[in-house]
Amino acid sequence: VWGRMYNQGQTCCASKRFIVLDSIADKFLAKFQAALALQEPGDPMDEKTTKGPMSQEVALVDLLKQVDGAVAHGAKVLMGGKRIERPGSFMETTILADVKPDNPAFRQEFFGPVAMFFRVKNEDEAIALANDSDFGLGGSVFTKDVARGERVASRVNTGMMFINNIDWADAELPFGGVKDSGYGRELGDMGIQQFVNKKLVRVNAIDAPA
């Protein structure tokens, strides 16, 4: 929940697609919806608030248009999908399902409180779906089998992968993506290399053959 909804999903590395194995999909979805429903919209300065507004009105309007477009092309709204009728640019927490590859929404980034939910039969199908994206900043895999998590992480085409944690940024962790999510890294030991001019110095013996 936090992976999708921190800052109301208005971050580049917030979770966008939730890809779940069929064997646990119903149980996951029920718990996911129940947890999302507990969010309390309000003034971000109020400690009781757990759901803030969109950054600006135009962002809300654009997001609502994206959801309507997804539905027009066959997606189903499992919860939310509308504006919250209260002062401010608030949107209902939303889950979209049945978003097929030919749906324009499949290729879009929903920059707000909208999660796309996918069911898959097995690990290979999950990885193929995860990699079928124009973006590749970060991702997460949750599993009791850490070795399996490492295997999946190595096959997902992103700049960052987190096992049993949400995608996160920290000054000590190199940050960056692949594909349309950019190139290069900032932060961490890799990030400092962006500010270093590297020099080659080769030493030969004075009497070595030319």
Say what each PLM segment does.
Residues V1-K100, I163, A208-A210:
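ALDH superfamily catalytic-core signature
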Residues E40-P41, R83, F90-A210:
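Conserved C-terminal structural/oligomerization subdomain of aldehyde/semialdehyde dehydrogenase
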